[in-house]
Amino acid sequence: MDTGGDEKRARRSEEDRLSNLPESLICQIMLNIPTKDVVKSSVLSKRWRNLWRYVPGLNVEYNQFLDYNAFVSFVDRFLALDRESCFQSFRLRYDCDEEERTISNVKRWINIVVDQKLKVLDVLDYTWGNEEVQIPPSVYTCESLVSLKLCNVILPNPKVISLPLVKVIELDIVKFSNALVLEKIISSCSALESLIISRSSVDDINVLRVSSRSLLSFKHIGNCSDGWDELEVAIDAPKLEYLNISDHSTAKFKMKNSGSLVEAKINIIFNMEELPHPNDRPKRKMIQDFLAEISSVKKLFISSHTLEVIHDLGCELPLFRNLSSLHIDFEDHTLKMLSTFLQSCPNVKSLVVEFKDSSKEDGDRVLSIPRCFFTTLEYVKIERPITGEARGMKVVSYILENSPILKKLNLCLNSSREKSESVILKELLTIPRLSTSCKVVVFEPRSCWVLG
């Protein structure tokens, strides 16, 4: 059989199918491919020879070039091409030693593409040098812009902002010329739907205010090595549906008008690395108010660190009446907190548990938890492999013995030096189940067991 010939014909058939597409569609496909690879497509056929020249965007990384001059020359030549359509996308990644020249060139390139009805601006500086690129003010008045993604640059104080179409903003370790720049940008983008901010101590913002009538999704990552009590995030977004906060440095989180919230992921310790003082009433009230604002969610992830702060401060939990899906990351010593938290979720149906070893000496308290019935729980997944040790088995027992309508419990099995898989399975079979219809599905590396 001529398998080589068949492969060539199949390859030609794929090429022909792609070539039969309209040029405008091919150019849109190429928009998501690194521009150097797009240029290489010119050797495919006569039709493809100049097609790359009409791709309405640039996607380029410095490390794709032999040296700095080749990098600059390529970008300059591409931007100099005549185009009938707008310049839709400018994606730039650079990491080079030519600091002064790079700053000048990047600003010049941004000004060029902004004047061509740019829709997507994505600039990432991997240099991490002493001086960053300051984004030119022309970006603030790019009325065609839809998506703005920046990393390791400086945003200047705007005199005028006109960004009526911007829906997505992602800022990663960005500096601001003053503390109000980001607040101005957010409040001026009337179509903003998604906001991601990854912060560091260099951004010089003590109080971050996120006020938006249109915002649907907000993710906040705090990367400050040291926190202080002045750091605060205040959110006022009445249409917000998705909230994701991972931050151990910011001391205060405040929310209002959060009735539209559907899903939240919370990993916060409110700048409380040390054991909090139980009489810190202002801190306790702030945390209680924050929890009350997110209590309308239907889906929630909450970390063991957050649970511990809530527990140690003696915070009163609100009722999460709408919550149907709960994902909890907890350690051995916080199992009691899991039980307490579940009592505040009267309608939860699905529970995912990430169960980790505790470094604390009081981990044995897991064995003495007051009984509590989880009357609505139908599905549970334990993500940590069960090895047969007492604490892991106690988690399984606690759920099975207190869930009257549980339908399925999924867990992974991992044999240990002390116990083989068969011994662990036998122990699982002896655990009483409050639900008569519950199935325990046990996954191990080579098989799956259903303990009916």
Curated annotation (Swiss-Prot):
It comes from the Eukaryota. InterPro entries: F-box-like_dom_sf, F-box_AtFBL13-like, F-box_dom, FBD, FBL13/AtMIF1-like, LRR_dom_sf, LRR_FXL15/At3g58940/PEG3-like. LRR repeats lie at residues 125-152, 174-199, 221-247, 279-304, 327-355. It holds the Pfam family FBD. Coiled coil: none annotated. Gene3D superfamilies: 1.20.1280.50, Ribonuclease Inhibitor (3.80.10.10). Keywords: Leucine-rich repeat, Repeat. Residues 361-413 form the FBD domain. Residues 15-65 form the F-box domain. CDD domains: F-box_AtFBL13-like. This is Putative F-box/FBD/LRR-repeat protein At1g78760.
